[in-house]
Amino acid sequence: MRVGKCFLGLAACLYAVAADAERVPMKLWYDEPAKVWMTSALPVGNGGIGAMFFGGVAKEQLQFNDKTLWAGSTTRRGAYQNMGDLFFEFDTPETCTNYRRELSLDDAIGRVSYTIDGVDYLREYFASNPDSVIVVRLTTPGHKGKLNFSLRMQDGRQGMTRVDGHTMTIKGTLDLLSYEAQALLQADGGMVETKSDRLEVKGADAVTVVLTGATNFDLASPTYTRGDADEIHRRVSARMDKAARKSYKKLKAAHLADYQPLFARVELDLDAEQPDYTTDVLVREHKDNAYLDMLYFQYGRYLMLGSSRGGQLPSNLQGLWNNVNNPAWECDYHSNINVQMNYWPAEVANLSECYAPFITYVSTEALKDGGSWQQVARKENCRGWAVHTQNNIFGYTDWLINRPANAWYCTHLWQHYAYTLDKEYLRDTAWPVMKVTCQYWFDRLKENAEGRLVAPNEWSPEHGPWEDGVAYAQQLVYALFEETLAAADVLAVDDAFVSELKEKFSRLDNGLHIGSWGQIKEWTIQEDKQGDHQRHLSHLMALYPCDQISYLKDKRYAEAAKVALDSRGDGATGWSRAWKVACWARLWDGERAYRLLKQAQNITDRDGGEHGRQCRRRV
């Protein structure tokens, strides 16, 4: 039985232990407002909707998203969209004292506090999963009647905003989808005036702003939609009405009762205390402080909880946070590493529930009768399904075909069973997908000159020639067959399909071949180039995320993997460096893995640093 042992995905997973002592607070905090969305605004999310807050004093911006809001269709890629923004404009000056902006990972609440003319101002931000809303609370502790500001809502595509009573609404249509978002302002004391494009608060003691939105996206529908604009309005309004009947105290209590038991399952204790300097100073000047490693690990878990709970879609290239309508690579679902990597920490970081959206996405699309994933396979006269590299939420798949991704996705379906031992899930959800995926490869594989079964005309993302028997494909198909046989054993399935699987598995090339300079070979015909610093480690799938290569199994292959990995070098983009960290850990080189981990903790500029500028849009 294969059980993944990764410790880095969205951020990093090192080694999680439960501690008897009082937990060290996990907080990102700063002494000034954010200036740039990508590098300094702070995220909140409930798995389906999310927001980024800047923490401005005279002006505040809350940019928000719904993970299902996409332009595009079943025939056009489109892109993930920015749903909109809330803009707060206060009657206070920009200068203040005691400024603090923080994100508490322990309770998933953002806070901004400062003092002006002896009055303390406090804001709290959170995204509630049980109530499906984003909440902003504004108070002046110890002072009454001091809140004076205007609130404006802006559609991410510059549509009209309707103001009705104390509610603001945006709505619109895209290629396939309709959408709506509402923001409700509730004031304690003072006055609220309704203007044509904003709400104005005067002399309030406290204010609660509740925000929510939805689209008519439905993954299971043949059209990928369910209901019209009126149905969306009813759904959003019902959600808002339910939240509006709760006090802020009850909304917050429900949020904490839902979130904290999940987050508190795991603690990484490296015997470090929370420092008294800001997080940017921690990263820039105190990287040897073990608190940074603790924070990095828990921030990864926080982001997973914020971008992948419930719903029909997994985390995308940016989780679910996006402030533009033309994001890099459309903020899509890349099948050659990115969407899979998002879920590497899920089980080992004890967030198994966060796997559900990815599993739903894969199983629904793979088994959709006549769906686009099945059509890709039919074009090659194969049963089952396959995908290309870039994928939107409507089944559209393009750029280069990535056949082995179907096997890769199935390793995740198996891993979820390996951790949960949920036999019902294995039988009803994972097994049907794994079976038809094997059938795809039954039809696709061919016999080589040595009598072994190989995948014809495959590549090694994202470089090199197309050849038969490329390591990337062979290692993944090997893992698929091995794990499907393990699933058959658990489910006591012994039929003609299993017999064929056993026969083909016995003849399958495992993709493990040692080359002329002692490396795991990437291709069978082309000689690997020593010193090739390609970001992908596709010829080392068997090392990580799969586990055919291990010092515990065969030292020769482990040593050859080490040679190949060392040849790739230590330079990398963020995701590639994470992969290298995991691989070096599998090779029992903790020093090298930790050195790369510390490199990953560098502050990134807006363009993603040197490698970010190199990795521009390809299509």
Where in this protein do the model-derived segments appear?
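Extended, hydrophobic alpha-helical segments in both membrane/secreted and soluble proteins
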Residues: N338, N402-H416, T429-D443, S576, ...
